[in-house]
Amino acid sequence: MFMKFLKEWVFPIAIAILIVVLIRSFLFTRVKVSGPSMEPNLQDNENVFLNKVASYKRGDVIVFNAKDEDPRYQSGDDKYVKRIIAIPGDTVEYKASNLYVNGKKVNQSFISLNERTQGTEMSFGSTWSLKTLSSGTLWQKKDRNNSTVPKGKYFVMGDHRSVSNDGRYFGFVDKKHVVGKVIVPF
C-alpha cells in the first residue's frame, strides 16, 4: 500500500517539482519591473518572463544585474530592464533629436515622439556619440573613449528616456551580466 502511494503520488510530484526547478534555473524565470524607465511599454511593478538562453539583437528588451554594471549601485540583487540599442561593433549617435546606429536612423516607434527627443537628468547636449558619452566619469575605465560597442557588450537605453538611468550614464552592459531577454510581460 505504501509503495503504491509512493509510486502514484510522491514520485510524480517530486519529478514535476524537479522539472519546474530545472526549467526555472536554466531556461525561463520571472522578474518584476522596478521603476518607470521602460514606460510606456513596461510598467512599474509589472512582471515579465525571461528567456535565459536567448540570443540578443538590437531592439530586444533585456534584464541584467544592476550592481555589476552601474558603479553607483552598490547593494542588493536588483535588476535593470532596458532595451538594446547597439550590439558589438555598432556606432551610436544622437543628433537633431534622432538616434542613429551605424549611421542609420533608428525607428523608435515603440516610444512617443516626445520621448525620442528627450534628454536625461544629465545634459549630454543635442548631439552625442559613444565617444562623447564614454568620456564620462561614471563609465568604467576599460570602456572609456570607445567609438564602437566592444565585443561581448551591449549599449542599452530605457524607453522613458527622460528618467532612465541607462547606458548613457554607466556605459556598456557585459553579456555575462545579462539574466535574459523579456519574452512576455504579464
Predicted regions and their residues:
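Hydrophobic alpha-helical segments, especially transmembrane helices
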Residues: 8, 25, 31, 83-84
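Hydrophobic membrane-insertion alpha-helices, especially the h-region
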Residues: 10-26
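Short, Lys/Arg-rich N-terminal segment immediately upstream of the first membrane anchor
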Residues: 1-8
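Soluble "head" domains of membrane/secretory-pathway proteins
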Residues: 2, 22, 44-186
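Alpha-helical transmembrane signal-anchor/signal-peptide segments
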Residues: 29-44
